[in-house]
A protein has these predicted regions:
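N-terminal pre-Walker A segment at the start of P-loop NTPase domains
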Residues: 1-19
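Conserved inter-motif catalytic segment of the P-loop NTP-binding fold
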Residues: 13-15, 20, 36, 62-156, ...
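Pre-Walker A (Motif I) flank of P-loop NTPase domains
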Residues: 26-30, 69
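Phosphate-binding/switch region of NTP-binding enzymes
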Residues: 31-32, 37, 41-42, 64-66, ...
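Hydrophobic positions on the alpha1 helix immediately C-terminal to the Walker A/P-loop
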Residues: 43, 47
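Post-Walker A helix-loop "phosphate-sensing" segment adjacent to the P-loop in P-loop NTPases
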Residues: 50-68
Length: 188
């Protein structure tokens, strides 16, 4: 345990690199939070399309270029077959560079165990070596024993993504919904 600590002069200093310049740093966790129905899925589909196809996205500065990369998304909210494939295709995505689980093939329910910090999550990231991976929404990937209202529990839950990001250079975009309860602040 104590061997994990060192003085700052022993750390190699690195410049930040960006998947989306000024917005989404490479190998780190970025959160996207907003009310339902404002276009979170449209934004992340645009980002995935751009990265998969090597073109600029809506958040890029003018003239920004990139090379096509492998990306992935995990969603427990929208159907890949009924909504997301079409949305990505219409956004100009390179569908061969996008990985997503096929829940119809998951006859024994193994995909339900793919949570933050799980061996299955590490296996997914290490096998596909994605540049960008989207989780929509965060609730679908938090283990059931974690209290999402506890900041410390959520930090511990998501900490393995930091290690995976640095080891495999995968950037994580985690989509969060604001309170959907009717009558919550700003809803009416």
């Amino acid at each position: 345990f104590l061997s994990c600590f060192k003085t700052l002069d022993e750390f190699e200093e690195e410049e930040a690199t960006w998947i989306i310049p000024g917005w989404i740093p490479e190998g780190q966790i970025t959160l996207m939070a907003a009310d339902g129905g404002v276009g979170k899925t449209t934004v992340w589909c645009n980002l995935i399309s751009a990265v998969s196809n090597g073109v600029s996205c809506i958040l890029d500065p003018p003239g920004y270029t990139r090379k096509p990369e492998k990306v992935g998304f995990l969603t427990t909210e929208d159907s890949v077959r009924k909504k997301l494939k079409k949305k990505l295709r219409l956004a100009g995505a390179n569908l061969k560079n996008i990985i997503s689980p096929d829940f119809l093939k998951d006859e024994d329910g193994q995909l339900r165990d793919m949570k933050f910090g799980s061996d299955k999550m590490k296996q997914f990231i290490s096998n596909f070596r994605l540049v960008l991976c989207v989780f929509d929404p965060v609730q679908g990937f938090v283990p059931p024993d974690i209290n999402m209202g506890s900041r410390n529990a959520m930090r511990d839950c998501m900490a393995p993504l930091i290690s995976l990001g640095e080891e495999y250079r995968t950037t994580f975009l985690v989509v969060c919904h604001t309170n959907k309860r009717k009558g919550a602040y700003g809803r009416d």
